UniProtKB/Swiss-Prot annotation:
Organism of this sequence: Homo sapiens
Gene Ontology cellular-component annotations: cytoplasm
Gene3D superfamilies: D-tyrosyl-tRNA(Tyr) deacylase
Record's protein name: D-aminoacyl-tRNA deacylase 2
Keywords linked to the UniProt accession: Cytoplasm, Hydrolase, RNA-binding, tRNA-binding
Enzyme Commission code: 3.1.1.96
GO biological process, one term: tRNA metabolic process
GO molecular function per UniProt: Ala-tRNA(Thr) deacylase activity; D-tyrosyl-tRNA(Tyr) deacylase activity; tRNA binding
Length: 168
């Protein structure tokens, strides 16, 4: 979590899943909707704030992929890389919202272009980290991701309300 009064540069929400399916493109006329999906693993929702830069990304990826939140069959907590489990990354600008009166405001979020670039680089770093992990390669772990800037439909089966918020 962010220490003291330090302003966070990013926020990530981690949620275990048994199965997750994300619509990345809606149906359009005769063209069917496009979906990505993962089996057992981790859904990572991510939001970047003003002031975030690419130097933050390796720390985020290292922390999120190595935190021991995933439960094995014998009840031991391990990282998603050690499980090994699939990963679905979803851009989630609403994680940057602040309540003002009865409305949510998102003035702290990074701009669209900066957010898109950071999100794209974050996804690439996650893919590289998973590809470099021998357990993940052997288990054919899948890293999927949503589309930055679009509304997306999420279908999620989870093994309990097991959700963690981490600020960077």
């Amino acid at each position: 979590m962010a220490e003291g009064s330090r302003i966070p540069q990013a926020r990530a929400l981690l949620q275990q899943c048994l199965h997750a399916r994300l619509q990345i493109r809606p149906a359009d006329g005769d063209v069917a909707a496009q979906w990505v999906e993962v089996q057992r693993g981790l859904v990572i929702y991510v939001c970047f704030f003003k002031g975030a830069d690419k130097e933050l990304l390796p720390k985020m990826v290292n922390t999120l992929l190595n935190v021991k939140l995933s439960e094995t069959e014998n009840g031991k907590h391990v990282s998603i890389l050690d499980l090994p489990g699939n990963i679905l990354i979803i851009p989630q600008a609403t994680l940057g919202g602040r309540l003002k009166g009865r409305n949510m405001q998102y003035h702290s979020n990074s701009g669209k272009e900066e957010g898109f670039e950071l999100y794209s680089q974050f996804v690439t770093l996650c893919e590289k980290e998973v590809a470099a992990n021998s357990k993940c390669a052997e288990a054919r772990v899948v890293v999927e991701h949503g589309t930055y800037g679009n509304r997306q439909v999420l279908k999620l089966d989870t093994n309990g309300p097991f959700t963690h918020l981490i600020e960077f």
